[in-house]
């Protein structure tokens, strides 16, 4: 299974995936993230899927840029948010320091551990010195194909190990929730 297969899954199942995620309320996570940012900060929604989080941030006064690896999800998110969502593979993305915060909700979990290290390093480099970065993973030690997509699951210790290998980040808050989706 490759990232191409995962992208094919999202490009093929765009409508059902958008429908199942767009109305999910992430209020607790949104509040934890935005409370660490000044109003009108620039946020990158890294793997914006349906555009749900992008729209929330925009509606709450933040400036937002959004990217996703799935061309079809980019189209759907652009329509929903009324901003241009950039089609970009995570492994190919780089940016100079300009973001106050980067939000990667259930997106980079589709990368293998080698690519995760590279992408998290690129995320670090794209952040201003405040380095507010939110990400989420399925809980566990699994790495491989599940339900037609590639996943890297992490625990608190494996996430800390990954972050320590990248350097430049400090885990300031960590919590476990139940999945809002079943797959």
Name each region found by the language model.
Residues 107:
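Hydrophobic adenine-recognition pocket in adenosine-nucleotide-binding enzymes
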Residues 1-97, 114-118, 122, 132-183:
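Class I (Rossmann-like) S-adenosyl-L-methionine-dependent methyltransferase catalytic domain
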Residues 100:
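Short acidic/polar active-site loop segments enriched in Thr and Asp
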Residues 103-104:
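A conserved beta-strand element that flanks and buttresses the S-adenosyl-L-methionine
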Residues 112, 127-129:
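Helix-to-beta-strand junctions that scaffold the AdoMet/dcAdoMet cofactor pocket
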């Amino acid at each position: 299974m490759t990232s191409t297969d995962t992208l094919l899954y999202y490009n093929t199942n765009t409508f059902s995936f958008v429908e199942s995620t767009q109305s999910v309320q992430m209020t607790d996570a949104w509040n934890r993230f935005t409370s660490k940012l000044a109003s009108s900060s620039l946020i990158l929604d890294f793997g914006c899927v349906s555009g749900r989080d992008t729209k929330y941030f925009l509606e709450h006064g933040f400036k937002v840029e959004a990217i996703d690896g799935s061309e079809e999800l980019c189209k759907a998110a652009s329509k929903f948010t009324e901003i241009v969502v950039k089609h970009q593979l995570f492994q190919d993305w780089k940016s100079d320091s300009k973001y106050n915060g980067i939000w990667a909700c259930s997106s980079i979990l589709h990368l293998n551990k080698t690519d995760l290290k590279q992408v998290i390093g690129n995320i670090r480099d794209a952040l201003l010195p405040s380095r507010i970065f939110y990400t989420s993973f399925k809980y566990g030690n699994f790495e491989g194909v599940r339900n037609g997509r590639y996943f890297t699951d992490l625990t608190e210790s494996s996430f800390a190990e990954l972050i320590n290998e990248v350097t430049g980040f400090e885990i300031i808050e960590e919590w476990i929730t139940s999945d809002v989706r079943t797959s």
